[in-house]
């Protein structure tokens, strides 16, 4: 029998599908990535084609093995991590989606959310699901699809339609429709799941009129869910044995499995999570209470703050504003000036996430004077990512009562040394950048490997968490507070912009 030497992590993100092969020492052997189309039918609406998600993800799996020149029978297990909240409804018989995937960033369900608020459900939802009422989460998206695709609610009741987040969709496709599951971390993002009883919440299903028949079974983040054939029928059968939403996977990949440990991921958005152990801390400061993974993939809780626009604001500088040619340019131009010349950019293109939760905020640039040039705006856009992170960290420390001593960071933007240094400056906290940047994939690989005994426990993995560089604060407290006060003022003015004046 061939020795099982590798784990594959599938990392299905918002803009691309990736596959990563890792060996027993958690070294990355090969990576394959394919981008797919972002669909914007109306302002504020965002969709993906679920078949394209599947096509890009399945082709990266084949590609990554070919690139590494390894055969599928050397793979011990597959772990899956995914963009969370994105919602897919498909036909059980044919496997065909009845509508495009409604993406986490999509704001089309703002009105449904207003109704939930008017019906006085905020406290119930916060207490039982850990979430705030916002279009971000899957529940209102499922309702929207069932409301708008004729006959779909009746079909769902008859058991003809299935709902899933992206992890569920991928596993369903990989197992030829044999397995309809999700894990606790993804379920905790739907607004349909009770994070205390660890079951689907009857009241939420009733309120949103979502038939229970269409929901997946919820399982631990580290166990064998089913097998997939690589290379079609008769190919090698490989266990799929790890699932976690991207942010929880990154938390696990950073080995933040003890209470009080935190990480910030700088991707399309920014996501900060702090592990709170076995205690679900209810936030009084606009954060989410969510499910994370303990040392063996069991249920832990975490506080989470989501910033919607991080890397996406750099893409805006590149694609819409044409101020830079690629993301790497942003650091070069930002360091061409000493400061932002009084400019603040509030990148609230799709509203504001934690701790404000204002779907009606819109992007704005404040403090423009005649001397402001493109470099100042580029620098201010980068700084906005760090300011938003501080907003979240302040809320997190207030809720948890824990003063953070170091923030572990990951995601594409951490390669930007200017941003990481400014992040440390504005937080007044050490920022630790790990050597392995692929921590989301790492988390999925760890969860999958632990389930099949590829690794015995997390102690084996501790020495792999090498910090490549540590950034320390380099500005005075008064300067830090002065700059942050300017940011708060700018945010205040960008809020409620889209609300029509009565």
Swiss-Prot record:
Enzyme class: transferase
Keywords (A to Z) from UniProt: Allosteric enzyme, ATP-binding, Glycerol metabolism, Kinase, Metal-binding, Nucleotide-binding, Transferase, Zinc
GO CC field: cytosol
Stated regulation of activity: Activity of this regulatory enzyme is affected by several metabolites. Allosterically and non-competitively inhibited by fructose 1,6-bisphosphate (FBP) and unphosphorylated phosphocarrier protein EIIA-Glc (III-Glc), an integral component of the bacterial phosphotransferase (PTS) system.
UniProt xrefs under CDD domains: FGGY_EcGK_like
Pathway terms, separated by semicolons: Polyol metabolism; glycerol degradation via glycerol kinase pathway; sn-glycerol 3-phosphate from glycerol: step 1/1
Binding-site residues for ADP, renumbered to this chain: 14, 18, 268, 311, 412, 416
Annotated PROSITE patterns: FGGY_KINASES_1 (PS00933), FGGY_KINASES_2 (PS00445)
Protein residues bound to ATP: 14-16, 268, 311, 315, 412
This enzyme's EC code(s): 2.7.1.30
Catalytic activity: glycerol + ATP = sn-glycerol 3-phosphate + ADP + H(+)
Residues binding glycerol: 84-85, 136, 246-247
Entry-linked Gene3D superfamilies: 3.30.420.40
One of the GO biological process terms: glycerol catabolic process
Task performed by this protein: Key enzyme in the regulation of glycerol uptake and metabolism. Catalyzes the phosphorylation of glycerol to yield sn-glycerol 3-phosphate.
Name the UniProt record assigns to this protein: Glycerol kinase
